[in-house]
Amino acid sequence: GVFNQLILHQKEDFRMRARTKKPPLDPVNAALSFLYAIMTTAYTSALESVGLDSCYGFYHALRSGRSSLSCDLIEETRCIAERIVLTQINLKILTRKDFEFQESGAVLLNADGRKKILTAWQERKRSIMTHPYLNEKIETGLLPYAQSALLAKYIRGEIEEYPCFLMK
C-alpha cells in the first residue's frame, strides 16, 4: 500500500501488509495501535469535558468497552499518528530493537519503543497549528478539545454544520 511507499529506510523491518490490531502483527501496526490508543484517551476526555458521551458514535457502532465517538473523531486526525510513526521510522529513531516479537505472532512496542513514541507524541502536541475553522493558532494537543467543542455546538444547534478537521 501507500504507507509502505512512504517508508524510506528500514523497509525490511517495517513492511506493513495490512492494518492489523488486537494483536498487531508487525511493527508499524504496533506503533500505530499504541498511538491510536493514546489519541482515544485524549478524545474521550475531551468529549466528556464538553458534555458528550464518548460511547455513542455516528460511524463506529456501539460496542462494549469502546469509545465509539472518540473513534469517529480520531478518523480526522489519523494522519498525525501516521506522520509520527513514519518520521520515527525514516529518521531511524524507531528500530526493530524497539519491539517484542511474540510466539503467537503478535508484535508489541517494548519500553524503549513506547518511550520514543510518547516523546514524539508530546513534541507534536506542543507544536502550533492554525485551526482551519476557528482560524486561531492552537497547540496540536488541544485539537481533540477544539473538535469536541465544535461537535457539541453542532449537536446543540449552535452552528449549522460540524466543521470536519482537514490537515493541509
Where are the regions that the model predicts?
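Active-site helix-to-loop segments that bind/position phosphate- or nucleotide-bearing substrates
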Residues: 1-168
